[in-house]
Regions:
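N-terminal export signals
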Residues: 5-27
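Intrinsically disordered, low-complexity regions
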Residues: 1, 12-14, 45, 91
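C-terminal segment of N-terminal export signals and the immediately downstream linker at the start
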Residues: 1, 21-38
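Short, cationic motifs built from Arg/Lys/His that form the positively charged side of catalytic pockets
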Residues: 3-4, 202
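Generic detector of short, well-ordered, non-transmembrane alpha-helical segments enriched
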Residues: 2-3, 170
Length: 261
């Protein structure tokens, strides 16, 4: 079996996180392969140019040499296995951008503008992107939420990104990547961070759909206080992380936590 076919079948045999009904359009390949109407195919995933230096390993080294054509081919490959939505994890790493910017020198990559390369490819093949607005500080999510200096740079970057890239048809919205841990609730700093960032995003791109991805639902308490927090947050999509991939939750247990949610 070809690698792409294996990935396609693997994805269609998994259970996706529930997202708004407007986002449940199923590609033709998925419709053909998914015979169980109760199981919704996975139609979105993560995307990144580089991971953190501590964990990136061979991944970072390989992607650092990608040409614009290789990025284009990668986006098309992802679309071919049934993905319709991609969440770009970062437009910068440790304060240096992956795109041409006036804020700081660009991280050396195999093409001049990887962000333009992937968004242009997504326009061609019909993928929608949630575009990140970080990482302009260290990887401590709470520090980045609270640091006003980082917020200033973040907003400058969003202005640049909106000016350079929001004309793309695939620019569906923003991803705010400073992920809050639910222990068992959102901290107040996270609520403020989300609302301030969303307000700025909506001024730049009024039709944007914005997404956050808090973790881990294993420790969350879904009660009236949690609901009140959600009611305060100006956010369109919350993509809850189960933590299976980082061994925080077992695959077998994840279903019951989503059921509680």
């Amino acid at each position: 079996m070809r690698r792409r076919d294996f990935i396609r079948y693997l994805g269609l045999g998994s259970v996706a996180v529930t997202i708004p009904e407007a986002m449940h359009a199923v590609p033709a390949a998925a419709t053909t392969l998914c015979s169980d109407k109760k199981t919704k195919p996975i139609s979105g995933s993560w995307f990144e140019f580089q991971h953190s230096a501590a964990e990136g390993g061979y991944w970072n080294e390989a992607l650092a040499h990608f040409t614009a054509d290789q990025w284009r081919r990668k986006v098309f490959e992802i679309r071919e296995v049934g993905m319709e939505y991609l969440v770009l994890m970062g437009v910068a790493r440790a304060g240096k951008p992956f795109y041409p910017s006036k804020i700081a020198p660009r991280i050396p990559m195999g093409c001049d503008d990887p962000l333009e390369a992937v968004l242009s490819a997504a326009d061609e093949c019909g993928i929608k992107f949630f575009v990140s607005n970080d990482f302009w500080g260290d990887l401590d999510a709470y520090n980045m939420m609270l640091d006003k200096g980082v917020q200033t740079v973040r907003f400058q970057a969003m202005e640049e990104i909106a000016e350079r890239y929001s004309h793309h048809a695939c620019f569906y919205g923003w991803y705010f990547p400073n992920e809050a841990m639910l222990q068992p609730y959102f901290v107040d700093a996270c609520v403020n961070y989300v609302n301030e960032t969303a307000a700025f995003a909506q001024r730049l791109t009024p039709n944007c759909v914005n997404l956050i991805a808090p973790y881990f639902i294993k420790e969350a308490r879904f009660d009236d206080h949690f609901v009140r927090q959600l009611e305060k947050m100006n956010i369109d999509i919350i993509a809850y992380q189960d933590g299976v991939g980082v061994n925080h939750t077992s695959l077998e247990d994840s279903a019951k936590f989503y059921e509680k949610l």
